[in-house]
A protein has these predicted regions:
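Intrinsically disordered, low-complexity regulatory segments enriched in Ser/Thr/Pro
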Residues: 1-7, 45-73, 80
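Negatively charged, low-complexity tracts enriched in Asp/Glu with abundant Ser/Thr
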Residues: 1-41, 103
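Polar/charged, Gly/Pro-rich intrinsically disordered segments
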Residues: 42, 51-54, 100-103
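Mixed-charge, Lys/Arg-enriched low-complexity segments
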Residues: 68-103
């Protein structure tokens, strides 16, 4: 399974180490209103994006479908979810308590 990370600057890395996910989450600590999020994308198009305030969004950017979101997600939980996406465990992420649409 292949995955891509999107840094806060917009730069992308294909197939990075899973160990780099902690550093990706740490990027949320920088103040950058122009680039507010980081993301992990599975090769199938499923993408989990995270914002500094604990907001995350889950959507398939390759297919039509309703995006979903959660608020107040702790950093530790975010790292777990990013890891699940990177490993291709999409059904685990799907089972989360998502709210419909974008916030």
């Amino acid at each position: 399974m292949s995955f891509t990370i999107t840094h806060r600057t917009g730069d992308m890395e294909v197939g990075p180490s899973i160990d780099g996910l902690l550093a990706l989450v740490d990027e949320l600590d920088r103040d950058d209103p122009e680039h507010p999020d980081v993301a992990v994308s599975h090769e199938s198009g499923w993408t989990l994006s995270a914002y500094p305030e604990g907001l995350i969004a889950w959507e398939n950017v390759e297919q039509d479908g309703e995006p979903r979101h959660m608020r107040h997600v702790a950093r530790e939980r975010l790292i777990e979810l990013f890891t699940e996406v990177a490993l291709g465990h999409l059904e685990t992420v799907e089972r989360e308590a998502w709210a419909a649409g974008y916030p």
